């Protein structure tokens, strides 16, 4: 029930992102390889995780480029099993280790990276808001140095420049399922794919 709040909103809710992704992968032999705190733990709340390799995401290194690198490493390990590797990739995290996209392309590591593109270092946004409130300074300037806007980043184009199929940016919730389906088909064919989804903060 809670997952349906803002279901048709744009930017896309993190609950819808996770629900739509699970609908596409649930009948596959899948492995989620990214942390889930950034998406309010929706995968744990909505997905059936029954095998130990289905969630190998949280390593405690959030916000320092952990997710992208760990996910590509896990995808390399999963490749020999023919397992569909999926990462819900935070945008600020990816920017710290952007070269990992080239690594995935160069070594032909099949992975579906679904961008949680909330256009900011959202973990820091919330921290700055808490600190500003604590010191009674207001939060109207919390975006300075913590958001990624003016211009917005097109991660699909960055992926293409690194040799990976880039899909998006997806801003309309109705376009999400077809984009994920296309991406999964390509990954199952052995390609790394990035689907850029413009999302709400959490």
Stretches with model-predicted labels:
Residues 1-77:
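Active-site diphosphate/adenylate-binding microenvironment
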Residues 42-201:
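Thiamine diphosphate
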């Amino acid at each position: 029930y809670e997952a349906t709040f803002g279901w048709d909103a744009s930017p896309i809710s993190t609950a819808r992102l996770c629900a739509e992704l699970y609908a596409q992968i649930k009948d596959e032999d899948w492995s989620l390889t990214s942390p889930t705190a950034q998406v309010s733990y929706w995968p744990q709340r909505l997905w059936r995780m029954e095998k130990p390799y289905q969630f190998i995401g949280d390593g405690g290194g959030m916000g320092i480029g952990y997710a992208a690198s760990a996910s590509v490493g896990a995808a390399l390990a999963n490749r020999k099993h023919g397992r569909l590797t999926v990462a819900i990739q935070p945008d600020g995290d990816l920017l710290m280790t952007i070269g990992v996209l080239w690594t995935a392309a160069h070594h032909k590591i099949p992975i579906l990276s679904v961008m949680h593109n909330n256009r900011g270092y959202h973990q820091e946004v919330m921290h700055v808001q808490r600190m500003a409130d604590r010191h009674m300074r207001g939060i109207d300037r919390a975006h300075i140095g913590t958001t990624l806007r003016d211009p917005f980043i097109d991660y699909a184009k960055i992926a293409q420049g690194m040799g990976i199929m880039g899909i998006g940016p997806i801003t309309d919730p109705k376009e999400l399922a077809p984009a994920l389906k296309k991406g999964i088909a390509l990954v199952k064919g052995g390609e790394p794919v990035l689907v850029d989804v413009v999302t709400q903060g959490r």
